[in-house]
Amino acid sequence: APQTVYEWTADVAVRFLKEWNFLLGIILLFITIILQFGYTSRSMFIYVVKMIILWLMWPLTIVLCIFNCVYALNNVYLGFSIVFTIVSIVMWIMYFVNSIRLFIRTGSWWSFNPETNNLMCIDVKGTVYVRPIIEDYHTLTATNVRGHLYMQGVKLGTGFSLSDLPAYVTVAKVSHLCTYKRAFLDKVDGVSGFAVYVKSKVGNYRLPSNKPSGVDTALLRI
């Protein structure tokens, strides 16, 4: 029996939108809210959902580009579809390469964050906290509010004091590591205050391991 050939026409597109318009609207509204309010300083859970959505964009784009290649309307569409497919695959590979390089430098799964390649690293009481930051800041601010420690507005934990803040904070990138030196510390009252860290050094380093090994904890060059 001959196979049925499906053609994507304007009437089919209109009928598809009529049937799926409500569901598509809800999905787009959900994605818009997540992208709008997904920040580490607001909700870590929403931010993780946002990262998952952004991460899924690449494979979805590649699948759609390949679909366009298979079902191209004409040679012009086919040519553009092939170019878009190649570009999407190359950019996705570059993302993985950069993420793996950053993971080698920091050892944190935040290295695979699709939004940024800047990872802020702070060692407090022997625990290294790694959090993503969007921009390359010249200064970083640590705030302690009655034992609640925030770094660039991102909450790290509770039960800390200003004396627990380290002398240095680092921001890891794919190609280098930025070191920030504590330049100012001020106590607002007995249990609250803030510290300002200023960028002082940039080099090709990796973070030292926080496991006890008897070696110097200085930054290790790679």
Swiss-Prot record:
Q: Which sites does the entry annotate for glycosylation?
A: 9
Keywords, comma-separated and alphabetical: Glycoprotein, Host Golgi apparatus, Host membrane, Membrane, Transmembrane, Transmembrane helix, Viral envelope protein, Viral matrix protein, Virion
GO cellular component terms given for this protein: host cell Golgi membrane; membrane; viral envelope; virion membrane
For side Intravirion, which residue ranges? 41-43, 97-222
* Pfam families (alphabetical): CoV_M (PF01635)
Subcellular location(s): the record lists: Virion membrane; Host Golgi apparatus membrane
Segments spanning the bilayer are 20-40, 44-64, 76-96
In terms of InterPro entries, this protein maps to: M_CoV, M_HCoV-like
Subunit record text? Homomultimer. Interacts with envelope E protein in the budding compartment of the host cell, which is located between endoplasmic reticulum and the Golgi complex. Forms a complex with HE and S proteins. Interacts with nucleocapsid N protein. This interaction probably participates in RNA packaging into the virus.
Q: Tell me its family.
A: Belongs to the coronaviruses M protein family.
Name-wise, this protein is Membrane protein
What gene is behind this protein?
A: M
